[in-house]
Amino acid sequence: MVLFSEDHIQETRRRGRIEVICGSMFSGKTEELIRRMKRAKFARQRVEIFKPAIDTRYSEGDVVSHDSNSISSTPIDSSASILLFTSEIDVVGIDEAQFFDSGLIDVCNQLANNGVRVIIAGLDMDFKGVPFGPMPALCAIADEVSKVHAICVKCGQLASFSHRTVKNDKQVLLGETAQYEPLCRECYQRALQEDREKS
């Protein structure tokens, strides 16, 4: 005789959620996004990854980490475009979220409310130490926030700040290793003071 057991009920309803991976430059944000997306693909989930079209540093069509790990992606100009590609998708990945418009917040909420797992990676602060683009609001609505850290190039402590090493005041300057360095709070404050003295 087989008894009905709730333990054997298989969950078939999709549960949406928002996961944010944030931190400074060179902290492994994109690396972690790629890892989570590849795990989802391995589990035969339908995935789609998006990045801002302006990010062509390593590849026009792929999301690429500073360590050269990559995964195929769709470059887009506007966050609203994400909804055009996600009707049959289980997991959505979004890299460099700080470069998207504020509409990304509603897009992510809409996807999660419709059962999609949304994984977002982005800088939480710009080179001035100011919260960057839609990232603060995305952290607020997220079900899970992972703050990742680089290592301070000056003292070896955990680094939360991205110091720009070239003179340029534009908020958006797509950076590679020569243009930014990760610093801890103390070394970052010292570097800002040195920058002011040079000006």
UniProtKB/Swiss-Prot annotation:
EC number: 2.7.1.21
Keyword Metal-binding among UniProt keywords: yes
Keywords: ATP-binding, Cytoplasm, DNA synthesis, Kinase, Metal-binding, Nucleotide-binding, Transferase, Zinc
SUPFAM superfamilies: Glucocorticoid receptor-like (DNA-binding domain), P-loop containing nucleoside triphosphate hydrolases
Active-site annotation: E96
UniProt record, GO biological process: DNA biosynthetic process; thymidine metabolic process
Chemical reaction(s) catalysed: thymidine + ATP = dTMP + ADP + H(+)
Main location: cytoplasm
GO cellular component: cytosol
Enzyme class: transferase
Protein's cellular compartments: Cytoplasm
Binding-site residues, ATP: G23, S24, M25, F26, S27, G28, K29, T30, D95, E96, A97, Q98
Residues binding Zn(2+): C152, C155, C184, C187
Family classification: Belongs to the thymidine kinase family.
Subunit structure: Homotetramer.
This protein's name: Thymidine kinase
Species: Bacteroides fragilis (strain YCH46)
Record lineage: Bacteria, Pseudomonadati, Bacteroidota, Bacteroidia, Bacteroidales
GN (gene name): tdk
